[in-house]
């Protein structure tokens, strides 16, 4: 989940940065180069923060996380939300993902992989050396009467009453107010 959030943040940053810097000349004048001595491999870092083009007031708020919803998510993902911070992180990730709904993608072609145009030859499906039943069953971790035994399905987790839902909502409100204050202070300095 955290890696998904990082990928989304990087994608939004690249959208913001790419939209403002149309050419390499503009890119060089608005940023400083860092890293490689090769001009084509330079990494450009903006000289000042670039405000988000997404209007945060239009972003859909994440749902209220009730005990029933948290239990349902834990059962589906087989991940226990150990404390309030874990639920708050999930709430922030959902809010961040909701920003993607506001991005206008009209006229943008979908991403295609390079492998779509490369032929993938397959070998003929001719059986080689036949394996014995005992050799096949050696791959199983558990066998009963010469049959593979599959692992049990998702075992439901017990409900946990440790989470303080009011604290989660308060922390989310504090986080949003911090971001609003920070955004207002950045606007005042400009």
UniProtKB/Swiss-Prot annotation:
Enzyme Commission number(s) of this protein: 6.3.5.-
Bilayer-spanning residue ranges: none
Location of this chain's protein in the cell: Mitochondrion
Keyword Cytoplasm: no
Catalytic activity: L-glutamyl-tRNA(Gln) + L-glutamine + ATP + H2O = L-glutaminyl-tRNA(Gln) + L-glutamate + ADP + phosphate + H(+)
A Gene Ontology molecular function term of the record: glutaminyl-tRNA synthase (glutamine-hydrolyzing) activity
GO cellular component, one term: glutamyl-tRNA(Gln) amidotransferase complex
Family, similarity comment: Belongs to the GatC family.
Subunit architecture: Subunit of the heterotrimeric GatCAB amidotransferase (AdT) complex, composed of A, B and C subunits.
Name the record gives this protein: Glutamyl-tRNA(Gln) amidotransferase subunit C, mitochondrial
Species classification: Eukaryota, Metazoa, Ecdysozoa, Nematoda, Chromadorea
